[in-house]
Amino acid sequence: MKPNYKPPFSRFVKKVHKPLQLAIEDAAEEVCDNPEIGEAKAGDLAGIWVYKFKFNRQEYLIAYRPPTPESRRQGVDVELLMIDFYQVGSHENFYGELKRYLKSER
């Protein structure tokens, strides 16, 4: 599956130092290899999944939306399916910022 990085995700990655950028890239690749590796959210964030990883004893979260099961069942080539990566960051204000971005995107 291919990653599709949304602006908040890309902005955060640009601002951080190289070792963390590489850790984020590795985590995104893990998600692309297995989209169900994270935890599905409910309520306001239904359809969004969050994958947690650690870097230098700090926990980071990646919010993403995997392809729907219907699109996977329809025989679409796995390499053509996109995973939308919305946000990455530490837990502080993560969900509030994510909700604000998703609301503005609609």
Language-model segment annotations:
Residues 1, 49-51, 62:
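Residue-level detector of beta-strand structural context in well-folded domains
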Residues 15, 30-31, 88:
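Conserved catalytic core of Hanks-type protein kinase domains
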Residues 29-56:
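A short, surface-exposed loop/turn module that caps and links secondary-structure elements
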